[in-house]
Each structure stands twice: as C-alpha cells, then as structure tokens.
C-alpha cells in the first residue's frame, strides 16, 4: 500500500494540504493536513490564525502542517518561530502529527523539539527538484 500523506492535489486516499492564509473550505470526501506554510508567513492575518485553529479541530484534519521555518523565504524568522510554536501546541493538544518544512533552519527545529518535548510524531517534509 502507498499512502500520500502530503499533496496539494485532491485524490482518493491522499491527505490534502490546506493553508488557511487563503479562505478555503474542507470537502468532506478528503482527509487533510492544515498549516500556515512559512512561505506565506508574511501574509498571516488574525483571520488566518482563527481558520487554522478551527480547521485543526475538524475530524477530517488528520495532521497539522505543513508548517515550519524557512531562512530564505517568508516573514522574519522570529515570527515564523512564533507560528511554528503555535502549530506544535495544536499538534499536541489535538493529538495529531506535525508536518514540518525546514530550510536552513534545522538547528532551530531541533531546539524547538527539545523545548516542547512533543509526544506526537514530527514528519519532515523533504522536497528536491524543480
């Protein structure tokens, strides 16, 4: 069995990634991960944070993320860390795994892991290619 746990294209049996920076709705025929991607961190609004919290608690959402830290794109790293910590807290309180994007920030991700000491799994999303 092959399971796609992270896709941006809805497909049967896949877990679809949703970023609540943009207004979206959850279609009940899919499972989801929901998170504020670091590339969009400079566009985060209070409404996007509220959507994140609401969506994260939905039973169709089975993972938190893609979230994380990116030294090359997005808002200042301090703000990204604030958002990342919020995602970690959601992951732990809702008992859902965390999907992480990390670019040139692995020491910060490791420090966050030590600081939070999470019980839920952390999944590093890796992508190489064009």
Predicted regions and their residues:
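Mid-domain alpha/beta scaffold segments of enzyme catalytic cores
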Residues: 1-130
């Amino acid at each position: 069995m092959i399971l796609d746990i992270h896709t941006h294209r809805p497909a049967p049996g896949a877990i679809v990634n949703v970023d609540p920076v943009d207004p979206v709705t959850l279609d009940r025929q899919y499972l989801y991960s929901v998170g504020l991607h670091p590339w969009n961190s400079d566009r985060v609004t209070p409404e996007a944070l509220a959507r994140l919290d609401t969506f994260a608690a939905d039973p169709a959402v089975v993972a938190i993320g893609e979230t994380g830290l990116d030294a090359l794109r997005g808002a200042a790293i301090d703000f990204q860390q604030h958002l990342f910590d919020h995602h970690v807290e959601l992951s732990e309180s809702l008992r859902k795994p965390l999907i992480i994007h990390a670019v040139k920030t692995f020491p910060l991700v490791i420090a966050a892991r030590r600081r939070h000491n999470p019980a839920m799994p952390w999944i590093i999303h890796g992508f190489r290619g064009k």
